[in-house]
């Protein structure tokens, strides 16, 4: 690909290969130059570090075509905890884009850092959002103790997104206040319908989430499929 200036590949699936950073860095350089952009990119479980993913996202941002062509982005199972990686991911997502399916599950991406970008660039096309097995924040303890607020963009995104059909925030240890903001945002959204919401394995029964569900879920009209399994509700 790197040696072909006229490469026509627009869909690339390298999932479950040991690409590592030494493989993704030259690929990133190529991504920055693809004249037709990229439509489908699956790099799940490729043993990438935050530095490698950060370089990739910087290249996708540099290539202006990708903002108007990339509809599928799967980075699941790679390590993306580094601040620079999160920054570059957010920079790409914050620009107007056409990403329809976004999977960054199991990447250690702090969700509270992500939603400002989603609100700015992903409210029109995004239909499938998989954020499972990520921490809501690396300051979750402060949020629980009331020392910090949930970012306003978190609720605003769910209130204003226009096409979302699937939301997976399972295994995220969502604080009760985050759950409340998510549900209230969806309750305000009159554009969505038939949404699937996965809240499984969030320990909602142990951290006040059950009370939030009881008080808020009745106002959420857009959700038709709700997964609350493995939450210790009622114990």
What are the roles of these predicted feature ranges?
Residues 1-235:
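Leucine-rich tandem repeat or coiled-coil scaffolds
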């Amino acid at each position: 690909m790197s040696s072909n200036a006229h490469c026509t590949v627009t869909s690339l699936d390298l999932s479950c290969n040991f690409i590592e950073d030494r493989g993704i860095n030259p690929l990133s350089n190529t991504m920055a130059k693809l004249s037709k952009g990229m439509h489908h990119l699956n790099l799940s479980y490729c043993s990438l570090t935050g530095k490698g993913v950060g370089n990739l996202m910087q290249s996708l941002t540099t290539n202006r075509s990708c903002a108007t062509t990339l509809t599928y982005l799967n980075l699941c199972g790679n390590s993306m905890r580094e601040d620079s990686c999160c920054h570059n991911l957010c920079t790409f997502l914050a620009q107007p884009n056409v990403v329809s399916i976004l999977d960054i599950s199991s990447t250690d991406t702090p969700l509270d850092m992500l939603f400002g970008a989603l609100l700015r660039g992903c409210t029109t096309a995004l239909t499938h959002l998989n954020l499972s097995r990520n921490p809501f924040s690396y300051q979750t303890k402060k949020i629980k103790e009331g020392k910090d607020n949930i970012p306003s963009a978190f609720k605003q995104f769910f209130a204003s997104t226009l096409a979302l059909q699937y939301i997976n925030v399972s295994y995220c240890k969502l604080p009760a206040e985050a759950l409340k903001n998510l549900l209230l945002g969806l309750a305000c959204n009159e554009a969505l319908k038939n949404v699937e919401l996965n809240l499984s394995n969030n320990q909602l029964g142990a951290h006040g989430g059950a009370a939030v569900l009881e008080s808020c879920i009745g106002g959420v009209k857009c959700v038709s499929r709700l997964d609350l399994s493995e939450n210790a509700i009622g114990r």
